[in-house]
Structure formats: structure tokens, C-alpha cells
Amino acid sequence: VYVLDSVRGSVTCFSSTAYGASMMQAVRLYEQGMYAESEALWEELLRQNQFQELAYDGIAKALLARGEYARSLPYFEKANDTYWYSKAFNEYRVEAVRAALPTVFAIAAILLAVLVTVKKLLRKRGSQKEKRPGAVRLAFSTMAHPISGYDEIRYTKQYSSFLAGAILAAWFLFSMIEYQYTGFLFNGHKPDSINVLLIFAKTIGLFFLLIFVNNALSTFMDGESTLRQLWISCAYALMPYLLLKLACFGLSHALSLEEGVWITVLNGCAVIWLVWQVICAVQTMQQYTFGKTLASLLFTVVGLAIVLFIAFLFFSLLQQVWSFVRTVFDELMLWQ
């Protein structure tokens, strides 16, 4: 490339560097589908520039062409190539399943034998007196039978603050793990951009804000639940949601891009199940009718929006006051 400079009256000649020449040659081979021939060039380019995504993609396709599916996956991930990552993962999964089948069948047979043995031992011991279900057992019963489960909890007054707190802590911790370690094909977040405070606000903070708003509304809607009953029962409502989200997390490491619809379906089921659990919890604890429960939840969402708007105005005003005080302080310092 020749560049004319009329001011200086000169001609400057630009020629490609060794790196540029290697890049052009590697790209030419890559576009022709000659991945194996371009592999050495890509490796040399990566030694000079570790942030060259096309080099990772070229090496990954060379490994894929040789049938080295497991080795190609990290390269496709660094190249951010979800399409070919999914193709390589499909082939790798077939090999992994074939290799693991004997072990899986052996473990399943052992577990089945242990289960049968335990059942026989329990049968020999005979029937015992039926024990009154504890707080933990009642909490888990709400997943399958939410209405009767919450009603029994309210009647027996067996609330476990420890279990409810553990559920909320698990939700917060799992949200961080999900953000960071969801499978590459289904993770739209950057691992280095995690904000723990934001995740805390979206989980624990949002949960208690909704609880406080709903509890405040219950004063005007003749609700019978206490604040403790309300937050514990709503924490119990998170259990099936967390279980389905955990299943989605596991599937994100086991499914290809084309099979991602199952994760979408499970996520939808998790949200629907959560909404139904919350409706049952609020209706039972507050002793509302179904229609009144829906109205209460709708007003709760509206109240949450109002609280967030007021909080935004407050922090905006606080920022303006701080800016004014800082400006006055700087002006006073200049006068000295």
C-alpha cells in the first residue's frame, strides 16, 4: 500500500508483517475448508496473539475433522462458536454415553439391590406407631399438595425458620452458580461480569420487599397471616422452582443447541409452578378467596413498582444533594 503525502512531498510504502502474511494464508486455507493444513499456522498465530478468535475456531475445526471431539470443545468455546460447538458436543456425547453405560447399569443394579434389602428389613421390623409429621416433612409436602400442605402447616403452626432461611440462601447461591457455570450453549452471560450485589437484590432483596408489601396490604384486606407465617410459607413455595431450575442447570451441560427447547419448557414449568405455589401459600395463610388472592398479588406487584419508583427518586435526590455539597466544598477550598 502506497500513501502519498502532499505536505511533505513523500511516498510511504506499507507492507504486511510476518503476522499479517501468516494470517492471510491461514484465512485462505480456512475458507477453502483445509482445516488440517491451516492448524499449524493458527497455532503460531495464537502464540503471538492469544485473543484471536478465528485462530481458536480454525484449530477446533481441525480437531473436529480428526475426530478429537473432546479436545475441540474448549477451542470452540474460546472462539464463541455455538453452532460448531453443538456439533462437536453431539459426537462427544455419543462416545461418552457408550463408554459410561456399563458403569451406569452396574450402579443402578447396586442401588436397586440396596433398596429391596432396606424394604425387607423395614417390613421385618413391623409397623410402628404413626408419627406426627414434623416441620420439615410438612414443608416438603407442599410441593405435591400445596393447598392441604399449607393448610396443615397453618393449623399445626409448625413453621421452620431455619429451613426457610436455608431455601433462600440456596436460591441466592444457586443464582450465582447458574450465572457463572451454566453450560456454554445456554449461558448468555460473561463469566467475568458477575455482580453479587445485583444478584442478591434480584433474589433475597426482591423476595423480602414483596413480602413486606403484601403484608402491608393484608392490613387493608383483612388478611390473617403474620409476617413470619407469610415469609416462611412463600420461602417453601420456592422449593419446586429451585428443583426445576437445578434440572435446567444440569441439562445445560448435557443437551445440544437443537435440544434447548427442553430447557425452555422446564423453565416455563418452573415459573408456572412457582406462581401456583405462591397463590396457594398466600390464599391459605391470609385466608382469602381465590379471587381476593389474585387481587392481593396484583396489588402487591403495583405496590412494588411504587416502592421502587420512590426509592429511585430518593437515591436520585440523594445523589443531587451529594453533588451540591461536594461542589460547595470544592468552591470553599478554592477560596482558601
State the predicted function of each range.
Residues 1-3:
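Conserved beta-propeller blade signature
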Residues 21, 55, 88-89:
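TPR alpha-solenoid repeat register
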Residues 129-228:
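Selected alpha-helical membrane-embedding segments in polytopic membrane proteins
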Residues 198-200, 210-317:
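Hydrophobic alpha-helical transmembrane segments and adjacent short intramembrane/lumenal linkers
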